[in-house]
Design a protein with these regions (language model features):
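C-terminal "cap" of GNAT-fold acetyltransferases
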Residues: 82-84, 115-118, 122-129, 134-135, ...
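Acetyl-CoA-dependent GNAT
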Residues: 3, 7-13, 17-94, 102-111, ...
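Short coil/turn segments at alpha/beta junctions that flank glycine-rich nucleotide-binding fingerprints
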Residues: 98, 114-115
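A general secondary-structure boundary signal
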Residues: 60, 96-98, 130, 155
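Active-site acidic-Proline motif in GNAT/NAT acetyltransferases
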Residues: 92-98, 123-124
């Protein structure tokens, strides 16, 4: 499958937000609170997603945005400033397992060099955990945040440069 990766433009914001909504639903359908998903307001979700102003790369297939990755300096690790974070990686379901997510992640890793990179994954999202492990991320921490009235198990995964860049 042919695709290109480029930086998000202002004109892309709505399409990116729509991908965020659609892929969020398909990803979390089996692990989120059904009441929350049933009451998820698409317009409100898209509006909120469109407002994010972090570095974002989009994947394009046939002039359509099919996925994105959002990353930047982390705010969750205060002991040093040599960490970046992947905040979101979403692909429409039909475009998963075509190396697009891998290419987005590799490009984000290049753009955050020389920082180490961290991210958080819901523990039940085993597909994502396996994907990140294949790239070289390792589970380093667990926490139990509460979203929408439900407590989740989250795994912090780190990509440490010294292990990968020799």
């Amino acid at each position: 499958m042919e695709f290109t990766i480029r930086a998000l433009t202002e004109e892309d914001r709505h399409s990116k937000a729509n991908v965020h909504y659609e892929s969020w639903l398909s990803t979390y359908n089996h692990i989120s609170v059904n009441d929350y998903l049933e009451n998820l307001d698409k317009a409100q979700f898209i509006k909120k997603s469109s407002l994010h102003n972090l570095p974002t790369l989009v994947a394009i297939v046939k002039n359509e945005i099919v996925g994105f990755i959002t990353y930047g300096k982390t705010e969750s690790i205060s002991e040093s400033d040599d960490w970046s974070e992947i905040y979101a990686l979403y692909l429409l379901e039909a475009y998963q397992r075509h190396m697009i997510g891998y290419a987005l992640t590799q490009r984000a890793l290049e753009l955050t060099y020389p920082d180490n990179v961290t991210l958080w994954v819901v523990e039940e999202n085993t597909n994502a955990i396996h994907f990140y492990e294949q790239i070289g991320f390792k589970a380093t921490e667990h926490k139990k945040p509460t979203y929408f009235g439900k407590t989740y198990n989250e795994v912090r995964m780190d990509y440490t440069r010294t292990e990968h860049d020799h």
